């Protein structure tokens, strides 16, 4: 064998399912790969994270001759990363990385197990990084879009008569629509926001907007996220304070 994997590590631990889009847009794995041959060598590098992938993520690179280099690799997750049966649960998993290549016409494979990683369920976040809440603003979701557009259209005459079609008027209509829809506030018994928002080590659970519209009951962060998402859907920018 002329290729070996000296080391490999994921840049994030724990791994938040809610941040899957962010992960896909930045380097996710760092791998040090050695090629002891005298020739450059095309290889396929793949790695797999249980519960988050149906198939390994694969990238093709060319190793320089007599090289011992570190490579930053991207990632792509399964389309059901938020909807699979395992998506609601926390999992301790052991990712692995493989390098496939040909040596003298023969298929060769170098592989290595990575350090175990915690994959947190789809609703988990930490308030140590408040910007994480942005990943729950699914403004283009069909359920969100239907709720926002249907209510704005249903009260278009009220909007025109009393609010002059202003953003404030549209915001009031959506706020009132959420009440008429039957949403109920209920403090999260396991992770009440006021108790854990300043605890940088605690994990909170937030519902996606489509989940709250289905459940009709949620904590303050669930309700604020849904309302902000609806406002963004109709073009009103919001900020979480």
Residue ranges and their predicted role:
Residues 31-37:
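Asparagine-centered strand-capping/turn motif at beta-strand->loop junctions
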Residues 38-47:
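Short, hydrophobic/aromatic beta-strand segments
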Residues 83-104:
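Short, aromatic- and glycine-rich surface loops/edge beta-strands on solvent-exposed regions
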Residues 134-215:
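Secondary-structure boundary elements
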